[in-house]
């Protein structure tokens, strides 16, 4: 029997208030946005064995990075916000995970009768760099 192990660190529904919206009027007031990140691992993460924060994706560092990027400027679209967040997460934590998933939700878009948030997701499988032989 073959057993496939998968491990995940999930930071779910981190709420931020951001200047986000297509129109100047919509961006006038901060909008509630929920951000979720999942770090997936194909092998047991080092942090599971070592119990060292240096081997983990520290969720305080992850949420601090999200705050830093999201608060740098107003955004018109959640797609653009998500892409900027995702690029920064891959640069900062891509060496610690096999896959990163990001979900950005605009809780209260100005759409009549819409009961749930608008969501945009990005996902990337991170492959180790090939070893080049001489």
Swiss-Prot record:
Entry keyword Lyase: yes
Domain of life: Bacteria
Active site: 106
A GO biological process held by the record: folic acid biosynthetic process
NCBIfam families membership: folB, folB_dom
Family of this protein: Belongs to the DHNA family.
Protein name: Probable dihydroneopterin aldolase
């Amino acid at each position: 029997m073959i057993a496939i192990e998968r491990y995940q660190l999930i930071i779910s529904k981190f709420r931020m208030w951001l200047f986000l919206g297509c129109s100047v009027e919509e961006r006038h007031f901060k909008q509630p946005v929920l951000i979720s990140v999942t770090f997936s691992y194909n092998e047991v993460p080092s942090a599971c064995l070592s119990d060292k924060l240096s081997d983990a994706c520290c969720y305080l560092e992850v949420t601090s990075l999200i705050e830093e990027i999201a608060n740098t400027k107003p955004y018109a679209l959640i797609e653009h916000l998500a892409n900027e967040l995702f690029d920064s997460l891959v640069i900062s934590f891509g060496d610690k995970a096999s896959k990163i998933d990001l979900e950005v939700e605009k809780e209260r878009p100005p759409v009549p009768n819409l009961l749930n948030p608008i969501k945009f997701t990005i996902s990337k499988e991170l492959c180790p760099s090939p070893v080049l032989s001489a």
